[in-house]
Amino acid sequence: MQLGAADTTVGINADRSPRWPRHVVGSITHSRTLVAVALARQSQVRAIGIDAEPIVAAADLEAIEHLCLTPRERQTLEEQSQLPRHMAVTAIFSAKEALYKCLYPLVQRYFDFQCAQIDLTGMADGVIHARLLHTLSPEFCAGYTITGSYLGQLDHTFTAFCLTW
């Protein structure tokens, strides 16, 4: 392994999160048709969160919007024409999943979709922004903003956040 860890399996913590080898941080994502893993040395990267989501089907759109979009995100979707609605909703959902995977190992607490707001205005350049609406820890307070990456490919949306030292 290029990260300096011996060959090993990824364990599962009591909270069902991955237990990475010592000195390694990472994130896992999967759908019915793909699996992806991002790994880094803990000495260089604090946390990583990645997500891959199939584009939300029209039949599921309203339920996903209700579950994961903030009122401001819904309003923004009404005003924007950058992406078809189902693709924008998928991107927001995916970004919140990636954000959770990135921050959970650092804050060690559950937080839901309403704890962050996603700004998609930079999507054309592959950039997304997440702003916390609630304080998760002394370091990650309401108003904290993190920049991530977005890629839309055929039938999937890919998002990622990475915190370096």
Residue ranges with predicted function:
Residues M1-W165:
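Core catalytic alpha/beta fold that binds nucleotide/phospho-ligands
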